[in-house]
């Protein structure tokens, strides 16, 4: 283990056979950051960071990224249990061989344009990316991200963690059943979704790899169940989240699990979404974190 401190296209409805799963409550399905700690939900009036080839767009550039993408993206409906389904945005890579599947877990703001644009970048990097809307059953109204965000923040605090993990189980099974998919999957999440992606490593023994962007770590008592390698990527100016790193690192070290993490000096919570912020530190963090993300998935899912 190591710590490295470094300066809408076509809509298609599909249904999968019901997936039966069990889950154990792991961490609260809540995000405890204050509004001031979050990157802005809408950045339409904020300056966008310069678009760097090979990086996801920031929030201000997400819609343009989606509108100009050459890749095939589609909406699907995935059956997750008796009477339950989750909608998801799926983006396919342009490659001649079968691809690993990556689940993309949204922030507290819900399945925003920005999260879908991150899925598009993962597809550009060679993965089948599936971003589930974990608020599907809340029936939030359609609308721009600025309308969705405050509703999502309130709704996400009511989600049951075990239910969230069952949704992810079903989405993973769906993804690996696709004709173009390998039978391996990883997960990446941001903020609230980062905590969920770490919790999924506790929950899912078949998970191939997890990447956690500025999400809190699970309770140390749960970490013995982790089997997948976990990569954590954190802003140095994110004290509440960063305080949960050392206990996880120590516990996973004793257990002999693979947990690597980087803390980027000066970068804030949500640095990948808000690349123009924190006086250049967020963009520097994004430029280091995203290649590390892709390399992690390639190492553990492509080999």
What kind of feature is each model-predicted range?
Residues 26-58, 62, 66-67, 75-177, ...:
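Serine-hydrolase catalytic machinery in alpha/beta-hydrolase-like enzymes
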Residues 179-190:
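Alpha/beta-hydrolase fold nucleophile elbow
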Residues 194-205:
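Short glycine-enriched nucleophile-adjacent loop
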Residues 206-215:
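A conserved short beta-strand
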Residues 232-234:
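Short beta-strand/loop motif that positions the catalytic acidic residue
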Residues 237-242:
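Acidic catalytic loop of the alpha/beta-hydrolase fold
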Residues 258-303:
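C-terminal catalytic histidine-bearing segment of alpha/beta-hydrolase fold enzymes
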